[in-house]
Amino acid sequence: AAVVDGATDRTRQIADEVLLEVAPGDAVFEFIRRCVDAPSSWRAATSRRPWSGGGADRALAAMLPLIGRILEAGQRAGTVRPDIVPSDLVVTLMSVRAIGDLCDADAPGTSRRFLEFALDGLRPGHRTPDQPPMSVKQLGRVLTDR
């Protein structure tokens, strides 16, 4: 629980800083970059083990509204696709972590390159996928392996 609580607090701090310091059109992209740069934030947030015992529900309840505010600001500014939802941003962080774990030891920077491709996919001008976004309930199950 302490790992999840610490990661949640750090991610909340990043979100608050981004909301105060960053122009709305850049907020989503800066939030994700800062989370990736703070391993205590995104590593715990994308590992299953720490999320047991209700940690996922508490953390998601605390974080998704803040992520939603950042996302809505970018969507209002026209820099983020209107079909993106908060869980898409969490999945983006999970994806960057997976690439980092698989590739960065042998090819440093691969996850950063992938991150930039992923961020470009959040921008307007792309077709809405046929698949629906992951729901909060599904995200909770993924994080806790239940």
What are the roles of these predicted feature ranges?
Residues 64-77, 102-146:
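C-terminal peripheral helix-coil segments that are non-catalytic and often amphipathic
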Residues 6, 30, 51-102, 109, ...:
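Amphipathic alpha-helical packing segments from all-alpha helical-bundle domains
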Residues 18, 46-50, 100:
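Secondary-structure edge/capping motif, primarily at the C-terminal ends of alpha-helices
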Residues 45-54, 134:
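Short linear capping/connector segments at secondary-structure termini
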Residues 21, 35-42, 77, 96-99, ...:
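Phosphate/oxyanion-binding loops and surfaces in catalytic or ligand/nucleic-acid-binding neighborhoods
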Residues 1-7:
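Alpha-helical DNA-contacting segments of helix-turn-helix folds
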Residues 9-41, 51-65:
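Hydrophobic alpha-helical connector segments
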